[in-house]
């Protein structure tokens, strides 16, 4: 399996393209000078295009992914607000954007050529939405609204239109600040990291995918931590055995084991990472974590112990300024 790692560095307006070896080493393939401050990224399900949200001219840049993993710009399209998080539906027909500062979410069609075009829908009235996450049925979009302490739920129809779900929202603890999400591969459980109180919530998903119920909340910080909690990102291994979160104040990755059915998390430990880890990801083999240090200007590579989930630091690599997003492609 050939794997390509994309790292977005907004302060230098660059995307660094790396090849990940089976041993966890990175080789730089390309440095892309981007048309703006590159922030969130998403890969098309068919692995032919990479989408990048940019500012200050709010928009999406579509890049064609070449056979070797390098990028060629294929198009640009506007967005209604500064893109905080982007994702696609599971079929690659629509791109969703959440704008924290714009208090909105939007839907943009993806053409047959893989290029994103202008939005067909904008949903206003969201307070600080931080991500847009399609559920395993591809029929429900979950939008954590950090300042509402709610995850808003929207039905997605075949024409790409979002409408409020019958369960309009899932409520978190007061002051939690829901931010990013991950799903178990069995489609029965979802996980949300909460930025402000430094916790992770586990939600049970009903059989038809129509209802989310909170079943567990766990602290992501060590017991002796007394600073300001500032959680950022969350990812689960492809086999569903281990889940990881990041905190930017302590600059740590927290390691959780996941019960076989996905319903219960247990803290395994904590691993130091690059300074201010706003974004990280797990490779498709489930063997490596790659974490970006927004203040260090580096990415760190960590090997996952397949029995415990604990991390071993392998290496660190310089990237651009303010790296904040990591996306990984398997070819």
Curated annotation (Swiss-Prot):
Biological-process GO terms, alphabetical: glucose metabolic process; pentose-phosphate shunt, oxidative branch
UniProt xrefs under InterPro entries: 6-phosphogluconolactonase_YbhE, Cycloisomerase_2, Lactonase_7-beta_prop, N2O_reductase_N, WD40/YVTN_repeat-like_dom_sf
Catalytic reaction(s) noted: 6-phospho-D-glucono-1,5-lactone + H2O = 6-phospho-D-gluconate + H(+)
SUPFAM superfamilies assigned: Nitrous oxide reductase, N-terminal domain
Enzyme Commission number(s) of this protein: 3.1.1.31
GO molecular function, one term: 6-phosphogluconolactonase activity
Origin superkingdom: Bacteria
Alphabetized UniProt keyword annotations: Carbohydrate metabolism, Glucose metabolism, Hydrolase
A GO cellular-component term linked to this record: cytosol
UniProt keyword Hydrolase present: yes
Family: Belongs to the cycloisomerase 2 family.
HAMAP family, sorted: 6P_gluconolactonase
Protein name: 6-phosphogluconolactonase
Biological source species: Serratia proteamaculans (strain 568)
Lineage: Bacteria, Pseudomonadati, Pseudomonadota, Gammaproteobacteria, Enterobacterales
